[in-house]
Swiss-Prot record:
Family affiliation: Belongs to the QueC family.
Pathway: Purine metabolism; 7-cyano-7-deazaguanine biosynthesis
GO molecular function terms noted in the UniProt entry: ATP binding; ligase activity, forming carbon-nitrogen bonds; zinc ion binding
Signal peptide as annotated in the record: none
Gene that produces this protein: queC
Regions that span the bilayer: none
The EC number(s) this enzyme carries: 6.3.4.20
Name listed for the protein in its UniProt record: 7-cyano-7-deazaguanine synthase
SUPFAM superfamilies in UniProt: Adenine nucleotide alpha hydrolases-like
Domain of life: Bacteria
Cofactor: Zn(2+)
Length: 229
């Protein structure tokens, strides 16, 4: 089956890529250079796409930093550090990028319909949707309706399907799945910083994304292979 995968280069989307590959799908990856401060994630996406042997990897460039509204695209805003996990779950964070997943899923829909793909795979999961409005199941259901109503394939009764295989999984469960699939964790990138200009890049260890990732590995008594400050 021909599918499109939204690939950020992070832990979740890389696991989804390796899962789709294990199912025998023909994988077409789509990544974005959208003005994010953590450019290292794009380098990670390119690396894991090559390792996984995707058929095609498209990188789309545009600048959401033109209007900001997020600490990931507005460099005048500070990234949250050392936040409590309870706080992460209860509030929409300043790292939320306005309508980002709507933009990403729209590009993925266009790409999928153009190449004749039947599904779009994305890495939303239980941890994400506790804090981000565009990672929640009701949002995915609404976008699925857009896919049905807004495309030729959808109107002909064969809408492209949005597949979110991690939607009910916690971060530790995702890591366990990734280990079974042989995901190269050392090639992935989750940090909201750019790696500090180091070679190899070094994750900050204190942003929300780093803390969730580190806690998940620790819960499984595993060592995250990424270097941290």
């Amino acid at each position: 089956m021909k599918i499109v995968i939204l690939l950020s280069g992070g832990l979740d989307s890389t696991t989804v890529l390796y899962l789709a590959r294990s199912l025998g799908h023909d994988c077409y990856a789509l990544s974005f250079n959208y003005g994010q401060r953590h450019k290292q994630e794009l380098a990670a996406a390119i690396a894991v796409a090559q390792l996984a042997g995707v058929i095609q990897h498209q990188v789309i460039s545009f600048d959401l930093g033109l209007w900001g509204g997020s600490a990931l695209t507005d460099y005048t805003l500070d990234l949250p550090q050392n936040r409590a996990f309870k706080e992460m779950a209860e509030q929409i964070p300043i790292t939320y990028v306005p309508a980002r997943n709507t933009i990403f899923l729209s590009f993925a829909l266009s790409y999928a319909e153009a190449i004749g793909a039947t599904q779009v795979y994305a890495g939303m999961n239980a941890i994400d949707y506790s804090g981000y409005p565009d990672c929640r199941p009701d949002y995915i259901a609404a976008m699925q309706e857009v896919y049905r109503l807004g495309t030729k394939q959808g109107r002909e009764g064969e809408p492209i399907q949005i597949i979110t295989p991690l939607i009910d999984l916690t971060k530790p469960a995702i890591i366990q799945l990734g280990n079974r699939l042989g995901v190269p964790w050392a090639k992935t990138w989750s940090c909201y910083s750019d790696g500090g200009g180091n070679d190899p890049p070094v994750a900050c260890g204190v942003c929300d994304s780093c803390r969730l990732r580190l806690a998940a590995f620790a819960e499984l008594s595993l060592t995250d292979p990424l270097p941290y400050r």
